[in-house]
Amino acid sequence: MSEDSSALPWSINRDDYELQEVIGSGATAVVQAAYCAPKKEKVAIKRINLEKCQTSMDELLKEIQAMSQCHHPNIVSYYTSFVVKDELWLVMKLLSGGSVLDIIKHIVAKGEHKSGVLDESTIATILREVLEGLEYLHKNGQIHRDVKAGNILLGEDGSVQIADFGVSAFLATGGDITRNKVRKTFVGTPCWMAPEVMEQVRGYDFKADIWSFGITAIELATGAAPYHKYPPMKVLMLTLQNDPPSLETGVQDKEMLKKYGKSFRKMISLCLQKDPEKRPTAAELLRHKFFQKAKNKEFLQEKTLQRAPTISERAKKVRRVPGSSGRLHKTEDGGWEWSDDEFDEESEEGKAAISQLRSPRVKESISNSELFPTTDPVGTLLQVPEQISAHLPQPAGQIATQPTQVSLPPTAEPAKTAQALSSGSGSQETKIPISLVLRLRNSKKELNDIRFEFTPGRDTAEGVSQELISAGLVDGRDLVIVAANLQKIVEEPQSNRSVTFKLASGVEGSDIPDDGKLIGFAQLSIS
């Protein structure tokens, strides 16, 4: 008598899974549908490249343990995990309805979004289920950290579940709600990211998810996050320096917003308060008037899933049948290929693959609507140098009024590095470097001028900011804000020749912030 497949434990043998279409991708991972033969069930497998993942295996295992302990109807079920070569495979439940983002894209592509993408009843129904899932996570001492439409999945029965496709978005506190639950890990997607996550000064807690939830509410109505058109550093700058976004932010055709009422707008504004302490909890939001409009899953099944693309429409086909655990590469045309270094070129498979016309490889780059490009989605902790001002003059005394001249060391200067790499190439396309001065105070309260060059097309704002930190010239906590303002200047140097901005590192002791004297502030100028 054959054993009931449902009673079998989930296999940790790679050969028991037949990999199928690619249904999602990020900077360090690919999500594929797969068929588990022993269980006779289709699943989703997230394949994490451990070489790119900067989180230690110990930390990953802790997070997987936290995922395995999540049992809630609004959280995607985790089945098992195992290592295949240099990849960690996470086996999870496959929801055939796809993500809410898939539905949004489908509606927009068909031009059915002129009066708003989803109606209030649909939004309320989806978001109420998301809140139920978030309330469960938060009560169990976990922060999701990447709430957005792309991580909200639908089952064929109209059920709604939060996916954790960021893997380490879960950080367990051992279920002890009394423990310190403040994180300082830079994880998430810029458009949905809370200001306190960007600043990394005081850390953040569960309220970061509430901000992302508010942005997601806007996304479900308008089809996109408020700052989706801007590059990542611009998003960071707008989020930190502007008033919180609203339903109207970034929307050109205001007609599409007319059907959205006061309770919806009020709910969004409650979530998008810059002070996290003023944001409601998930439990408090569930009692908000707007969610009285929510209906049941049969409503979603009938009204929303009928407008959703099928799994075959969503899927990205793989050019070669995956016969091994080779690496996948995204190509210029959006397709997927298995890497050539995973098979024998003299084999029949190798000869066949080489003889085929293949799309050119492209460097990995993730759009702003997906992931922060220079930050691994599996949380990288920003390291603040122990001696922030090691390379700066250190005399004792009161706040200085005249700046000390400091240059970025040649070994760390991005423009010089780029020139060294291209020396002898004879390229005529080299852009003229922009000479800049960053004026700020060191830990001894001395005013310093840090001079450096930025070469458009070669340097990046993030890279230069990191070089300044590595050289001990800038506090590590100011990485984001310095990069954001540098990006602002190099994008429009004619209109932004000088900017003064508040530093995330703040002021020491009894000092009072002063933008004129640059106490707690910095000034970046074109010299």
UniProtKB/Swiss-Prot annotation:
Enumerate composition-biased segments (Acidic residues).
334-348
The reported result of mutating residue 473 to A is:
Abolished interaction with SLC12A2/NKCC1 and WNK4
Annotated compartments? Cytoplasm
The reaction(s) catalysed by this protein are: L-seryl-[protein] + ATP = O-phospho-L-seryl-[protein] + ADP + H(+); L-threonyl-[protein] + ATP = O-phospho-L-threonyl-[protein] + ADP + H(+)
The segment(s) forming the Protein kinase domain are 17-291
Q: Where is this region: Disordered?
A: 315-360, 405-427
List of residues that carry Phosphothreonine: 185, 310
Tissue spec. comment: Ubiquitously expressed in all tissue examined.
What does the UniProt entry list as the effect of changing residue 46 to M?
Loss of RELT, RELL1 and RELL2 phosphorylation. Retention of some autophosphorylation activity may be due to complex formation with other endogenous kinases in the assay
| Highest taxon of source | Eukaryota
Q: How is it modified after translation?
A: Phosphorylation at Thr-185 by WNK kinases (WNK1, WNK2, WNK3 or WNK4) is required for activation. Autophosphorylated; promoting its activity.
- Specify the effect of residue 448 to A: Decreased interaction with WNK4
Keyword Magnesium in the entry? The reply is: yes
N-acetylserine: residues bearing it: 2
Database matches in CDD domains = STKc_OSR1_SPAK
Reported EC number(s) for this entry are: 2.7.11.1
Notes on how activity is controlled: Activated following phosphorylation by WNK kinases (WNK1, WNK2, WNK3 or WNK4).
The effect annotated for residue 433 to S is: In a metastatic melanoma sample; somatic mutation
Which BP terms does GO give this entry? Answer: cell volume homeostasis; cellular hyperosmotic response; cellular hypotonic response; cellular response to chemokine; chemokine (C-C motif) ligand 21 signaling pathway; chemokine (C-X-C motif) ligand 12 signaling pathway; intracellular signal transduction; negative regulation of potassium ion transmembrane transport
Return the GO cellular component terms, semicolon-separated: cytoplasm; cytosol; extracellular exosome
Which family does the record assign? Belongs to the protein kinase superfamily. STE Ser/Thr protein kinase family. STE20 subfamily.
| Function text | Effector serine/threonine-protein kinase component of the WNK-SPAK/OSR1 kinase cascade, which is involved in various processes, such as ion transport, response to hypertonic stress and blood pressure. Specifically recognizes and binds proteins with a RFXV motif. Acts downstream of WNK kinases (WNK1, WNK2, WNK3 or WNK4): following activation by WNK kinases, catalyzes phosphorylation of ion cotransporters, such as SLC12A1/NKCC2, SLC12A2/NKCC1, SLC12A3/NCC, SLC12A5/KCC2 or SLC12A6/KCC3, regulating their activity.
- Per its record, how is this protein called by name? Serine/threonine-protein kinase OSR1
The gene behind this protein is: OXSR1
